[in-house]
């Protein structure tokens, strides 16, 4: 038995880069309360239960069968993030847990149900949502208790670019932002796709559309990647995946009467080809940081932009100044978005895209919501990265997004705030660049290939 335990521990170890924590230790840390309860809590018969007030909630509308698995993965991801774990680990383990529940506890293989625009089946999906929620800890317990011969080799997953991602509710009553930060395709389906995918979705009129986008972009991305034409550029693939995502979201919005929508800023990174593509709708910005500055790669889709204003009016819309800012038909201060079905065609669902080479002087990509860009310009962002690198060790690189979000709230941002960062060079290079050292030492770093 001792030998089996040693082998099992070895399987869970991780030695790649500076990600020195084992996956086993991360799981045990995240679920410490459940493990403690399992080890010594014993239910005593006839023990009176404390009074718990019951809040009435309207029963949820049943979603379609083809969305159950993606919805479950995002729900688990959100729960893992609340337990304080790094975003890349949360992505990987949310897929692992959802797959374990789907295979071991569910009578229906929801992972295998494909999207079909002509079929909208909702049978048993409410029960399925409850199943995926209730079986998170049992699934983790099974994963931890598997013997060495059958447990997944988790160390294979620690690959791809380094990422950081976080969000804060700020002064808003509800959190309508969502995000994702996949270091590569291995975090989605255990495949070998090397492309990294990052995104921020800023919801409005409810969280439904932003949550749907974060839960299902990985599905449409993989579908496009698997069926891509050799002539399709990275930019084409990202655009197609967003268009397919919006198609699916539109069906769900109509069926469930969603009235809101979401901005989107997405980035696909191919480190092998030294290329990155961005696709966006709305005013959530995307930046790249070089050795000397941040520069914005996206253009905000708002009524104040002359081209966007002209398109809205040509589509039959009107622009009104409400509360000191232009709004489409007096309602929305955006001209493009995912969802917002009642506002079409004035509110366009067509993403804008670009593809740029990754230069040797580029260090990281940063995606954010307007809660960040409303209070920080490009120079501010550079100084925040510099301040973090000088105050914290490089091992804390995953906390950079939380640091920027916190500083945005302190600077007076009244919105939800979200930041996702993809490192185009190892975090150690960013720290060397930003450390307050001599000019000679700094110039040596910036000249590195």
Swiss-Prot record:
InterPro entries under this entry?
Answer: PP2C (IPR015655), PP2C_BS (IPR000222), PPM-type-like_dom_sf (IPR036457), PPM-type_phosphatase-like_dom (IPR001932)
Q: Which PANTHER family match?
A: PROTEIN PHOSPHATASE 2C, PROTEIN PHOSPHATASE FEM-2
Q: Which domain of life is it from?
A: Eukaryota
A Pfam family found in this protein is PP2C
Give the residues the record marks as binding Mg(2+) 1.
202-203
Annotated residues for binding of Mg(2+) 2 = 202, 370, 415
Protein name per the record: Protein phosphatase fem-2
A single Gene Ontology biological process assigned to it is:
apoptotic process
Q: Where is this region: Interaction with fem-3?
A: 54-56
| Record note on cofactor | Binds 2 magnesium or manganese ions per subunit.
Cofactor(s) it depends on:
Mg(2+); Mn(2+)
Recorded GO CC terms: Cul2-RING ubiquitin ligase complex; protein serine/threonine phosphatase complex; protein-containing complex
Which reaction equations make up its catalytic activity? O-phospho-L-seryl-[protein] + H2O = L-seryl-[protein] + phosphate; O-phospho-L-threonyl-[protein] + H2O = L-threonyl-[protein] + phosphate
GO MF term (any one): metal ion binding
Subunit-structure text: Component of a complex containing fem-1, fem-2 and fem-3. Interacts (via N-terminus) with fem-1 and fem-3. Component of the CBC(fem-1) E3 ubiquitin-protein ligase complex, at least composed of cul-2, elc-1, tra-1, fem-1, fem-2 and fem-3; mediates the ubiquitination and subsequent proteasomal degradation of tra-1. Interacts with tra-1. Interacts with sel-10.
Q: Which gene encodes it?
A: fem-2
Write out the entry's keywords from A to Z: Apoptosis, Developmental protein, Differentiation, Hydrolase, Magnesium, Manganese, Metal-binding, Protein phosphatase, Sexual differentiation, Ubl conjugation pathway
Q: Which PROSITE patterns match?
A: PPM_1, PPM_2
